Structure formats: C-alpha cells, structure tokens
From Swiss-Prot:
A GO cellular component entry from the record: cytosolic large ribosomal subunit
Signal sequence residues: none
InterPro entries assigned: Ribosomal_protein_uL29, Ribosomal_uL29, Ribosomal_uL29_CS, Ribosomal_uL29_sf
Transmembrane segments: none
Protein name: Large ribosomal subunit protein uL29
Recorded family membership: Belongs to the universal ribosomal protein uL29 family.
Keywords for the protein's UniProt record, in alphabetical order: Ribonucleoprotein, Ribosomal protein
GO BP term, pick one: translation
Disulfide topology: none
Superkingdom per UniProt: Bacteria
CDD domains named among the record's database cross-references: Ribosomal_L29_HIP (cd00427)
Length: 65
C-alpha cells in the first residue's frame, strides 16, 4: 500500500524509469531462482505486484492526458 502512494507522486517519466528498474530486478530474481540461488522468493511476487501498479498508473495518467 505504501508503494502505490509513493508511485502516485511520480510523473510519467519517473514512472517509466521505475518500471525499467523493476523489470531489471525481476529479470535478476528470475535468474537467481533458475540457478537455485534465490534466498527470498517472496521478492518475486513483490516485484511483480509493483510492476503491475506502475503499469496501471502509467495507463491512468495516459487516459487523463
């Protein structure tokens, strides 16, 4: 819940940057998971949820524009 509030304060450009960072993080976590080195599997779900929230906000801001 706190993260969506943090994301809502950002503009479209910052959200796009945040989305790229989250996608990179998701890729790294998936690689760790595939190699069996992932110590905190809950992070995959958290990152996926954050990606969905950022994409929703980008779409929302696009519709308002």
């Amino acid at each position: 819940m706190k993260e969506i509030i943090k994301f809502r304060k950002k503009n479209r450009q910052d959200l796009n940057i945040e989305l790229l960072q989250l996608l990179r993080e998701q890729f790294n976590l998936r690689m760790q998971s595939a190699s069996g080195k992932l110590k905190q599997p809950h992070l995959l779900r958290k990152v996926r949820k954050n990606i969905a929230q950022v994409k929703m906000l980008l779409k929302e801001k696009e519709c308002v524009k």
